[in-house]
Structure formats: C-alpha cells, structure tokens
Amino acid sequence: MQADFHEYKKISNFINLIKNNEDLEFIIGSGFSESLEKELPLNLSLNKGNSIYLHKQIKSKKFFLDLKKNKICIPHWTLKKDISSNYLVKDFKSFGGNMINNYIKKIKLNKTQYFQKIIKGEHISIQFYSKDLDIKILSICKQLFRKDHCNPFIIESIVSKKFKRTIINKLHKICLRISRFYNLNGINNLDLILEFKTKKLFVIELNARPGLSTNMIYSKHKTIFKKSFEKEKFKNPSFFFGTHIIYSDKKLTLNKKQYEYIKNIQFSNNFSELPRENEIIEKDEPICLVHCKSKKFKILRDKLKKISYKFIRNLELPDG
C-alpha cells in the first residue's frame, strides 16, 4: 500500500506558489519521497534532505547489491520460487511495514517483489543526521507492530530504547558506511534487526528522509538544521520517548462533532498530523500520531495506550 494524499493537485499548486522563492529550504518527507516520480522544480541546492533520484536507488534491487558490496549484513533474499515458509514476500518500495506479507505457497511475484528470509530478533530503527560525509546518531528506537496476520510488520509504535555501547558503536559504523557510500544528507532512518541468538545486526531498509520519529527528534534536537548543531557522541536518553499511530478500524468521515474535539486538542504536544473536518480516512489508514515521554519504559507504554484510548473513545470509534 503506497501513501495516498488525495491532494496531488494541491501539492502541485503549492509548489508553483513557492518555486520562485530562490532562498527556500525544503525537505522531501515520508510518503512524498516514495511517491514522487521526478525532482521538484525548486532550487535543489537548498534541499536539506536527499534527492528523488537517491530515493529511487535505495528502493530497488540495487540497494541490496550495494550493501553486499560494502560488506553490510542483510537477510538472505531471492527471486526464486523454490523456498520455504520462513520467508516474507516484500516489495523493494516498502516502507513503514507496508507491502510486506507472509509467504503464500505458489505465489507469483510481480516486478518489484522479492522473498526475504525471516530473522528472529528485535526490530529497531536508528535515526541519524548526515552532513559532509559524517553522521550524528539522533535516536535509536524499538519498533512495535500491529497484530495483523496478513500484514505482520505494519508499524504501530516506536519507542526510544537504551542499548549497550558495543551495539551503539556497531550501529554507528553501519550508518557511517552507508551514509558515505550514498553521500546522504540530512535526517535518515535505517531499519535493522538485532538477531536474538547471535546479536548480529541485519539491515532491512533505508528511508533517507524524516519519518515517524520526527516529533521525537525535534523534541531533543531543536537546532538540527543550524550551523551550531554539533555531532557529539550519542548517549542513551535519560527520558524514553514514544510515538503511537492510531489507525481507523473502519472508513471514517469526520463529522462536525468529531472535528470540534479535534480542534480542542490540535495544540496539544501529545498529538500531531490530526485530520481535518470532512476528511475521508479509509479503513486501516492512520488517523493521527500520539506522542509522550517518561523516565520509565513501562510508564511510557501505558501513557501511549491511555492517551490513544481516550482519543478513540471521544471520537466514538471501535477500540483498535
């Protein structure tokens, strides 16, 4: 499932409105980087992120070939049909857990799909800032998934987590190698699996743009795009940060009463990407994001659940 903005005309109109502003800095964010087919008609030297060309490179077979060339561990993948059920069916363009399915016998792959071996381990994502062939780790998060057998890796939450220095050093080395190979710029997200048995790190995918962790990053690194931003050594956080996605269990069009509730919470630090009045949200699409922090991991998880439950109840939605 690819991002559907329902508003390509509005996006085009907005770009036409701003494209003559030669001093305008911009970032191509989540969803847009996966959907756009060509570079924006803006001053590309002011792009604070990565190009559409690069996004297309890393969302293709070439990405895995590049990683192998750089001796970076990835799960075994193949286009052959004679495999066992301990493989997933993935799309090279997958992000956020979309376009990943469990193996089905006699399945026929399309041109952008492949089989990837299942690695039993902890799913983590690392956010890092790239500039001038150097990097700074911004945060390291644990990924939590929705309970959905057909789509087992749809991300529901990310929560920051503390890791041993040996793991942090390994993550830094992997990010630095990838960043230098692709000459990455700005905020990037790398998804990995820390294998339970061997403690080996396997790279799953690179998303070379801001994503679900944006709120978390800006709450800790407010000067990230300023010249004064320093690339000091990453330290485990004193607070745990978390972001939870509230999905709709049915097709939803916000009525006036529901939108009044949305307006009352729109300036809360606990919410972002809230919907507009009369906006149509399809079943299983995100409604909004919930954010909070705590000094204890368990309390953070409980707070995310409590805030999400209250939101769902006030919108009179089924629990989910």
Where are each of the predicted segments found?
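Generic beta-strand structural signal
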Residues: 82, 108, 130, 194-196, ...
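ATP-grasp fold ATP-binding core
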Residues: 67, 75-77, 84-102, 111-126, ...
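Short Pro/Gly-enriched beta-strand edge/turn motifs at strand-loop
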Residues: 20, 107-113, 171-177
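Peripheral (often C-terminal) accessory segments that flank ATP-dependent C-N-forming ligase machineries
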Residues: 228-320
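Conserved protein kinase catalytic/activation segment
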Residues: 199-202
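A short glycine-rich, hydrophobically flanked beta-strand micro-motif that places a catalytic Asp/Glu
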Residues: 184-197, 320
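ATP-dependent carboxylate/phosphate-activation module, predominantly the ATP-grasp catalytic core
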Residues: 117-182, 207-229, 235-236
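Conserved N-proximal alpha/beta basic substrate-recognition cap immediately N-terminal to
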Residues: 2-80, 95, 280, 286
